[in-house]
Amino acid sequence: MPKKTTKIDTRVPKFIVFMGQFLYRISPFLAEKFARKLFITPIKHKIPKREFQMEAESIQTKLFVPSINKEIVVYAYGNSTKKILLVHGWSGRGTQLVKIADAVLKNGYSTISFDAPAHGKSGTKTTLMLEFIESILAVEKQYGPFEFAIGHSLGGMSILNAIKKGLQVKKAVVIGSGNSVVNIVNTFVEKIGLPHKVAVLMRNSFEKKYQFDMESFSAYVAAKDVTIPVLVFHDTDDEDIPVSEAHHLAENLSNKEVIITNNLGHRKILGDASVINRIVEFLLIKK
């Protein structure tokens, strides 16, 4: 039987692949520790020009989230009392959904978004989805109530989990959302060139430290407790999360609309005019 080859992501710096494989040869446990640190450390990007206006015009405040003992930066964009919550994904920032924000502002709404822990202007260097969820609930308590919630990637997963934990919104939109946490870990380990054994060790480490089943935070699990209308967007060319995950998520939502796009990938979809128009229609026009 031919040996299975690992699908290393060409976007991953070669030194990371080299270091991981070097450590694995010494000890799988060293490689797991290395991979786990990478997994919880987002990359901070400079704010692109298209987000300058939202960044400049938003009222920015710091919010302490007691449940995780961390401080985040919150962006209040627009003046309407009718508010929509926006949640960015991994290595994103509070202004990343600017095109969507501008569209809903034109329709009489304002937005509240935030830099998740270890993202944007928020402090610390590491985080995980649990902290995204707790941040959402803290933001709702301080800045809510919200009419709707829109999340991209990990932000979509976090919104569904937050709804399960009590976030009150009338409708939600998830764009390019992750689904199975175990699949995310497995894919991450594969992309950095390490054997599946490291993914198993990572899962064991997280579950031992935080005392929970990682898969219980999967979007499809949370979806079973979500009864509000949810619009699911996903692109067939999403290079980070396969479109099959969107279909699996949708199977577990009782009240959903699914739109599959093409040639937009994981991030370009956030600025696509037709996607934004459908979001506005779903949230603000469709009854």
Question: Where do the PLM segments sit?
Answer:
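Hydrolase active-site cap/lid region
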Residues: 164-212
